[in-house]
Amino acid sequence: MNNGKPQTLAGSGGLTISDREFTQLRDLIHRRFGINLTDQKRSLLVGRLQKLMRNLNLSTFSDYYEYLTADKTEASLGELVDLVSTNHTYFNREKDHFDYFYQTALPAVITRLKQERRKDLRIWCAGCSTGEEPYTLLMLMMEYLGKDYVNWDAGILATDISDRALSIARRGAYPTDRVMQLPEHLRRKYFAAAGADGMAVIDQVKREATFRRFNLMNAVFPFKKPFQMIFCRNVMIYFDQPTRDALVQRFHQSTEAGGYLFIGHSETLGRSQTLYRYVKPALYQKGA
């Protein structure tokens, strides 16, 4: 109980954050990245920023806020989002999605494109983190299309707000335990040994992934053509409902008729949304 007095929270390194300072940073993070930091995340924010602030010789969170807002290059904002965002993932996470992609969604899209005499297979991984999701999808596309893959304008656009995550994704090298969830035949075919305890995605797969830094809070998505499938899994859990609703609206505008939106199994678009048709948990389809 605070009796109406401003509160401060001290981190293990001695830095303290006041109500006003936390509100300033929380509002900035929400405004720029859509991430909704609740009061329960206050100690997390303090803990993750302490080392960075010491390295910058900043003694208060007000000084850090001024540093952020004065940086016109926005590099400091990139550092901030790297620290507050979570990049925990692994290959074949939420396997049901990949099974549906390979067995149902991809065949349906390929059949429709052939009927329309098109060869442009457009898939976007929004919030791709360290690259496991787009690489898994590419392997499945190559498996499904076989030798015919080279005749398609395929590949995957993979975007994230974190430069640190994108750097790992572009390298395509992972600890072996992160890869073990994949079926053995995919590991054997699409990976090579990397160091004493690592595996690297082969170049044939890596060159089919286009990794870009992109902020999902952009008011307008700059894509010239819509996508047949959008994967945005375990991203919207960090957003409040108005932010989610606005993002889903932009996703819908960027989805082809009949296209799919995959979200995380802990997420839902809610019963009130009418843009997409519900297919199964965490999977939606745009009307034809």
Q: PLM features: residue spans?
A:
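Conserved AdoMet
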Residues: 2-122, 264
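Conserved class I S-adenosyl-L-methionine
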Residues: 118-131, 157
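Extended basic-aromatic, gly/pro-enriched interface segments that bind polyanionic ligands
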Residues: 126, 147-231, 235-246, 268-270, ...
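Conserved SAM-binding loop of SAM-dependent methyltransferases across substrates and taxa
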Residues: 130-149
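A short glycine-rich, Lys/Arg-flanked "PGG" loop and its adjoining helix->strand segment in the class I
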Residues: 245-257
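Conserved beta-strand signature within the Rossmann-like core of class I S-adenosyl-L-methionine
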Residues: 257-265
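Class I S-adenosyl-L-methionine
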Residues: 267-288
